[in-house]
Amino acid sequence: MRTTIFKISGVIIVILAQCAVAIGEPNNTAMLAIVEPNRFLTTEDYTGYAETHNAGLKNIYQQWITATEEAAQAKSLPEPQFAYGTYAQETEVYERQMVIVTQMFPWFGKIRARAETAVRNAEAAKQKYEAARLLLTKEVKRDFYEYAYLSEAINIIKENLEALRGFEETAVARQPVVAKGTETPDTVYARAAITKLEDMSKGLELLSEVTAGRLKASLNLPAEINLPAPQWKDFVPEIIDYDLLVNLLRQKNPELAGLSFEVMAAKSKVKNAEKSFYPDIGIGVQLEQMKRPGANTQESSRDTMIMLSLTLPLWRDSYISEQRRAVSDATNIEQQRIRAENSILAKASQVCYEYNDSIKRIGLYRETLIPKAEESLRSVEKAYKEGNADIITLLGEQRAIMDYRLSYQRVLADNRQNLAELEMLAGTGLNKQQ
């Protein structure tokens, strides 16, 4: 009966442990939604899938769980000791046997310092996971917007190819009487421009495949899966205040938070090292039984002894070395945090400038350069059809508007990529902070 109860209890413990692991997984409704690869369209589709499927992020998550379990173990006492003794050769007078149970208690404050160290390390592991999650999100968004830019650029070039082919037809129509097998200068210029754009389009298509490969690697998807062209969301970029960004960064950046917890863990380790000079206390009970040979159990005598023991911390040189090493580690981590903060602030300053500058360039292309280039192209195209402009001028105007449109898409992608990096550095979304 007792064996059956133990088996049932074991099954229940296993089930509860599995439930606990399942509950411990990152919990986000958007993340947990399984998205079919051919349905990836928005950044939310990509980042949500990556956060639940990326192998590297899962590995760091398990490191966090391991550190959490170690923190729980650090609060426990050492295992009690059990000893049993009897005489190898029984005497003719008495038969003697004894049982000893001992529990060691670390010196006052040792367990607390050890537990604080483990808890701070677990918090640091949590922040490391959060930093890895934000880095993955930034990388996915960077590749997403690059993929979107390349898709738009390919479409723009295809539209320009159609326009150039129209110019070629116009050039042929304007000079129909030519020797067989010869081309007019206008058609030569037009076809040269077409060939150049076709080569440019092929290069962008290859680059698009490379970018899609990076996305599939981040999402842990097979290489043979085809990702659809991503869709841009309409957005109105707003200037980010650098002082606000710095405040958010110092409060929420997970890398800095993780290093802060590591500093606290190192200081707790110093406290623990300082207590190595103090002994640990052991309390035990010894039960001894004696009886004459042939006597029954009721005629035996039992003695109980309370035991007190102490460890002897004699090797003080090793304790001093341990303390110095703990102090050195704490100082090193403090300096590491200072260097990390300075580096992150410098990076944030540069990216914030690029982000705000891109907003100005977005307005310049959208409101001034592209509309004026389109107006100029219409005027030159009309003049060319009427014979009042040459093909070189027309091709130049067409190339100018294509370059403006490509630059506009480039600056849109740069703006979104810079925002993704700023959000990673700040440790939070910045659209809600505007």
Where do the language-model regions lie?
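Small/polar (Gly/Ser/Thr/Ala-rich) solvent-exposed segments
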Residues: K58, L77-E95, F105-A131, S151, ...
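Periplasmic alpha-helical coiled-coil/stalk elements that build and connect Gram-negative outer-membrane
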Residues: K7, Y129-Q251, V351-E354, S358, ...
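Amphipathic alpha-helical coiled-coil segments
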Residues: T47, N59-A74, A132, L136-I157, ...
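Bacterial N-terminal signal peptides
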Residues: S9-Q18
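Acidic, low-complexity, intrinsically disordered peripheral segments
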Residues: R2-K7, I23-T29, V35, S407-Q434
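Bacterial Sec-pathway N-terminal export signals of envelope proteins
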Residues: A22-Q81, G85-T86, F105, V119, ...
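Residues on the lipid-exposed face of transmembrane beta-strands in outer-membrane beta-barrel proteins
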Residues: V99-Q103, L215, L308-L312
